[in-house]
Amino acid sequence: MPTHTRSAELFEKAKKFIPGGVNSPVRAFKSVGGNPIFMAKGQGAYMTDVDGNTYLDYVGSWGPFILGSMHPRITAALEHTLTKIGTSFGTPIEMEIEIAELLTKIVPSIEMVRMVNSGTEATMSAVRLARGCTGRDKIIKFEGCYHGHGDSFLIKAGSGALTLGAPDSPGVTKGTAEDTLNAKYNDIKSVELLVAENKGNIAAIIIEPVAGNTGVIPAKKEFLQALRDLCDREGIVLIFDEVMCGFRVALGGAQELYGITPDLTTMGKIIGGGLPVGAFGGKRSLMENVAPLGGVYQAGTLSGNPLALTAGIETLKILMEENPYPELDRKGAFLEAGFRDNMQKLGLNFVQNRVGSMACLFFTETPVESYDSAITADTEKFGKYFSSMLEQGIYLAPSQFEAMFTSTMHTDADLEKTVKANYVALQAATK
């Protein structure tokens, strides 16, 4: 059994200076028990902690590492930028044009794009733009969907808020909460009712087309099409939050996979190659309202900085050249089938949701299609499962309500190791 002496020491020290000892709540292991593991190095599909233990990584920095950690082309490009170009200028640079051209080529909905520094900035900016263009105040989001930590989104949110059992946050004003309406995921009638009750007042509907912060819940295609039709009828801006699923479930994201085009798209994670980045883009008629061209203000000191753009450009080029998506889907299917076989052997019938290389094993027998069904999962069983997988050298997200990501660097031997560990961990979780 691996020891974590140094991690425990560092966590005690961190708690003196950092709230909760972590810089993002889900990292704290509160829902799975024990102390967080402090990592020292990542390479390919593996991470090594400060105590020298090595883990097969299925977190992938929470999604960005579709090509694994320390990809040689990305690290070489970053080294060149760091030593030959610079880290930031606060001026326009040619790389901004290069990544914008790539994004408009890859993502069906994007005609113009603005770079920002995080997914949260992207979603906040997209909603502000929708409000500015429509002259309306209210937005509709979906229970359990996570769109970053902007005030408008922390009402029945997913991700760390759901993990900690607090889907609403103190500090969100009553007025902000009143302007954020929550519908049920995959339930068009709940959306239509809110639109009817707030006729002419809905600026935007924002949705993760593959929800990744309530576990993994794919939207039904007919549901997304109904949203598209409703927005067209009512003059509502449809926003796809593809910060997590963009460039992950398909090169052009979920909108390519489903064949349904939103008005605005938010992006992040993969387009930074592991560095902080975000972007929002969409129809030219909307994006031309962003300052300095239009009146909707958005700015950022480090937006479009050379390091983040270097990693993003190189990542996108590799994805375009190599088209790893069929192989990533094969790997995801291998794990899904292996887990299913293990459950059959053990007489278990837990739910698996998967889209390509993005998956979740829910400790419930109820089909998971929304927030309400996701929270039927047994988090105590998941905690035992997580601990057993960790002991066997498999690092999963420390929450029942997060995704499991497979990368191009996971080998067949890695996948077989994971399936074997899953069998042991399922026994530990259910005994």
From Swiss-Prot:
Q: Which domain of life is it from?
A: Bacteria
Subunit comment: Homodimer.
Q: Tell me which Gene Ontology terms the entry assigns under biological process.
A: chlorophyll biosynthetic process; protoporphyrinogen IX biosynthetic process
Q: Which Gene3D superfamilies match?
A: Aspartate Aminotransferase, domain 1 (3.90.1150.10), Type I PLP-dependent aspartate aminotransferase-like (Major domain) (3.40.640.10)
> Hey, which pathway is this one from?
Porphyrin-containing compound metabolism; protoporphyrin-IX biosynthesis; 5-aminolevulinate from L-glutamyl-tRNA(Glu): step 2/2; Porphyrin-containing compound metabolism; chlorophyll biosynthesis
This enzyme catalyses:
(S)-4-amino-5-oxopentanoate = 5-aminolevulinate
Organism taxonomic ancestry: Bacteria, Pseudomonadati, Chlorobiota, Chlorobiia, Chlorobiales
Give the CC-aspect GO terms: cytoplasm
Task: Tell me the keywords, alphabetical order.
Answer: Chlorophyll biosynthesis, Cytoplasm, Isomerase, Porphyrin biosynthesis, Pyridoxal phosphate
Q: Name the chain's protein.
A: Glutamate-1-semialdehyde 2,1-aminomutase
Give one GO term, molecular function aspect: pyridoxal phosphate binding
Query: Which positions bear N6-(pyridoxal phosphate)lysine?
Result: K269
What enzyme category does the UniProt record give?
isomerase
- What's the family? Belongs to the class-III pyridoxal-phosphate-dependent aminotransferase family. HemL subfamily.
CDD domains recorded: OAT_like
Q: Which cofactor does it need?
A: pyridoxal 5'-phosphate
EC number(s) of the enzyme? 5.4.3.8
Name where it mostly resides: cytoplasm
Subcellular location(s) of the protein: Cytoplasm
Q: Which cysteines are joined by disulfide bonds?
A: none
